[in-house]
Amino acid sequence: MQFGIFTVGDVTTDPTTGRTPTEAERVKAMVTIALKAEEVGLDVFATGEHHNPPFVASSPTTMLGYIAAKTDRLILSTSTTLITTNDPVKIAEDFAMLQHLADGRVDLMMGRGNTGPVYPWFGQDIRQGIPLALENYNLLHRLWREDVVDWEGKFRTPLQGFTSTPRPLDGVPPFVWHGSIRSPEIAEQAAFYGDGFFHNNIFWPATHTKKLISLYRRRFEHYGHGRAEQAVVGLGGQVFMRKNSQDAVREFRPYFDHHPLMGGGPSLEEYMDQTPLTVGSPQQVIDRTLAFRDSFGHYQRQLFNVDGVGTPLKTVLEQIDILGEEVVPVLREEFAAGRPAHVPDAPTHASLLSARVAANTSAATTG
């Protein structure tokens, strides 16, 4: 089981002080968050991708490459790579380059994002969002697996005898998660390729999230990649912790009330009851996270969002310390104890390379 942090890279005013960090401060804070995640023993840091204010995460591979040079163990990922508006050729080359720089500590999450205007900014039509996602990923999948590609589609110029460079490290493409919060077509796509499926698990009730994950699991088995319970699932979650729940709720309430997506509707208490948001003690976060397994089955990756509401960096780092010291060690033990032997771990470069070598050896022996 992998545990980590995911961020969307927003620049948000702290409602308790009225201070808004500069873009430079926010970019550097994201790096600091990643370094803290490795320091406390977490496994993954994932950054989003946005091309509009109030976000600064416009170039994920630039940031992840910088973090790669400062870390040794952390898996570097994205909480969204925009498969709809990025050229698949550029994605193939950028993430292969990052693989080489990070010695394979790379995977990525494909998504369509949640900002409609980004489509025309990059010359695309939002009404074609799903077809774009399907076609672009089909090309990306081939670019990483075929040395020479001839390709023609609807949304970009054809390719003739094209080779993307550098080639994936050790001939092993980065593992891909397909992220979606509402689109069954994306769950179907993840299942078709035998890739992972990730739900951010923040704003939606468990009944909604369960429908998409269950669809993905059924279709994963349908396409012959393994049993439904062997499908590779990742979840997000938003948490805020203090030693006791009363202090956590008191401190977090102004951030909730002033948040553009959460404030102004249900109360904090109602929101926590209706969604996976957990504000309370470390034990409450442990209990809530373990309950995800009851709702969605055994899964492979749990990422927490701890920085998305304007909380100052000092507070964010305190949250990561609590995760590393009090929450994740318990979760690792509890998730491992109940995990059937046939349920796989999250793929890594090392495990994918080992599987590739084994497959090649088997083919050579039988051939």
Predicted stretch roles:
Residues 1-76, 173, 343-345, 356-361:
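N-terminal beta1-alpha1-beta2 module of alpha/beta enzyme domains
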Residues 44-67, 82, 114, 201-204, ...:
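Glycine-rich, proline-tolerant flexible connector loops at the mouths of alpha/beta enzymes
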